[in-house]
Amino acid sequence: MFFRITIPTLKEGTKEDAMSFVKNTVFPNFSGTPGLISLTSNSTGENSVLSMAVWESKESASAQDDKFQETMAEAAQFFAALPQIFEGDAVFGKVYQSIRKEEKKPGYMRIVIGVVKDKEAALDNLKDNVEPIYDESNGLQITGAIFDEDTLISWNIWDSEEDMNTASLKLQEILDIGAQRDLFDGDPIAYIGPVYAGRLFIDLNEGETPV
């Protein structure tokens, strides 16, 4: 699977309009696009939102680059600055709850972005130290991670903020260990908030992995 994550900073006072644009324009325009697996958008702050598109492959995403650029041009009315865009093939992840196509399921998303010194060591840390915490957690829906050059982007979606916070305490303990913190060049940035719009175009089954 191929992921594209878009993180704009919004002009003050435009957040509600931007969210409506995503729900009423972006989602309908891309629904039914060949190779598109899911669209997810969440609110991450007073003037920030985040959107993630999941594709079968980089090729299927690239085939829609013109439509993507047209959409970004239309959305520019809401942007205070050019958005950050991260993309890459999945290197980690798992489905923890089966979710049916077009199922409406509330979610709370946590996405962490950081520049890593050693990609292999960072991926091993996800598998060896983070995944066991995921496996023991309650309310977890799905996890994933990509690399965009030397930047690691990892995420998890939960049933509720409470479920996420419970697991986040354990995840932060792992991150605070010196050896784990040394994996990053600087402190990672976390974007956290409720999912306000989502569309799933295939069935996801518990235990499946995007890798």
In which residue ranges do the predicted regions lie?
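Short S/T/G/P-rich N-terminal loop/turn motif that feeds into the first structured element of a domain
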Residues: 1-50, 56-211
